[in-house]
Amino acid sequence: MGRWGRQSPVLEPPDPQMQTTPPPPTLPPRTFMRQSSITKIGNMLNTAININGAKKPASNGEASWCFSQIKGALDDDVTDADIISCVEFNHDGELLATGDKGGRVVIFQRDPASKAANPRRGEYNVYSTFQSHEPEFDYLKSLEIEEKINKIRWLQQKNPVHFLLSTNDKTVKLWKVSERDKSFGGYNTKEENGLIRDPQNVTALRVPSVKQIPLLVEASPRRTFANAHTYHINSISVNSDQETFLSADDLRINLWHLEVVNQSYNIVDIKPTNMEELTEVITAAEFHPTECNVFVYSSSKGTIRLCDMRSAALCDRHSKQFEEPENPTNRSFFSEIISSISDVKLSNSGRYMISRDYLSIKVWDLHMETKPIETYPVHEYLRAKLCSLYENDCIFDKFECCWNGKDSSIMTGSYNNFFRVFDRNSKKDVTLEASRDIIKPKTVLKPRKVCTGGKRKKDEISVDCLDFNKKILHTAWHPEENIIAVAATNNLFIFQDKF
């Protein structure tokens, strides 16, 4: 098996070639099952980068963000299928993909005119829309399988064609996105509309010709990776070798080859023999950006494990474990829930990683396991409201986080459509709002402040007035420029640094 690990038992197989094992019992406590994660991290910058790449000081010594675009209907009546469930830039930032709860994938392409403008603007137009997943029904377990897109990951582009992976709770699909501006015509046996010609009407031999047609973007499924997960898939990650990828559910992580759909290899399995002994679940997993044998995964107990596939076929024993000891004075009924890591992302350099729990985001050095090197509170003012957040289930929300291209800033989301941006160099942070009130082009975002006391200033909002139904769970940062995409319910906001 080599570094592939042991072969994973393929579950619920429709294909007789697939290996099968009896489905495990249902997972206990909701505390674990609802803590798989997604969170987003906010960043604050102390210098503004202009579009040409030169640094210019902002008026207050900090970078200013301005509105660029909003995508999606502006109606207050939002259907559940239109809610955005993931956002992802491709490796050069020219394409931006979103997935929603209706199983659709929408790809936006950078507007060439906005990129060529001086200063450059971050504007995107719809490039392609397709239905990635359909709702299914598991007759063996009498369970509905939602069509919701949990994750999207791009493969690096090697030719004019783009490839991406998308997944719902059970099935990962590889999609090919290509352009076509030519078609063939003048066939002897077919008409232009595709109908077969009557042989009696064929009186002359025609040479097929190539015709120019309006640009057509086609998305076609190339591979379907299914029947390998008993529990819901929470993460997919493409390896740096661009040949393999991992998929993680609550208890297992499987390794796939992009050319092989009928088998995967189980590289992590934390399922106990007795399910009553279950103490944690996997919440997120990701490959190292440059080392193809290294990956990390986080758990609901607040730990992050780094594994090396060269050490063993089954990575049940980690190479490193990152965990911050809990302060006994902060121990409470909710400690275990809020310490669950909802998202983990390795930096572009591969030296650091960030993790998001319910109240904070932490930066870890891969060379230091004992504690994070930086900790940024996201919405510490909610600590006093954990009881009510538990009752309305908000405490189980899955916030994602992301790096900027230079690993100098991080971003994540919060409630009331707020998102946070943290500058690692200046240690400054800012709270911004994705609001329809600021959808005029070039509108500069004003920093927002949350007040916890009785008196508040004019530009502050009381913590009691926060809308917990409005939340920023998914964000993405352009890999090369200061352009960010923020998903707010059914709308996608695009912001960039001030012109």
Swiss-Prot record:
Residues 1-30 are annotated as: Disordered. One of its GO terms (molecular function) is protein phosphatase regulator activity. Keywords: Repeat, WD repeat. It comes from the Eukaryota. GO terms for biological process: centrosome cycle; imaginal disc pattern formation; maintenance of neuroblast polarity; metaphase/anaphase transition of mitotic cell cycle; mitotic cell cycle; negative regulation of neuroblast proliferation; positive regulation of canonical Wnt signaling pathway; positive regulation of smoothened signaling pathway. Residues 11-28 have a biased composition (Pro residues). The keyword Repeat applies. SUPFAM superfamilies: WD40 repeat-like (SSF50978). GO terms for cellular component: cytosol; nucleus; protein phosphatase type 2A complex. The keyword Secreted does not apply. It holds the Pfam family WD40. SMART domains: WD40. WD repeats lie at residues 79-118, 144-185, 228-266, 277-317, 336-374, 391-432, 467-498. Could perform a substrate recognition function or could be responsible for targeting the enzyme complex to the appropriate subcellular compartment. PP2A exists in several trimeric forms, all of which consist of a core composed of a catalytic subunit associated with a 65 kDa regulatory subunit (PR65) (subunit A). The core complex associates with a third, variable subunit (subunit B), which confers distinct properties to the holoenzyme. Belongs to the phosphatase 2A regulatory subunit B family. This is Protein phosphatase PP2A 55 kDa regulatory subunit.
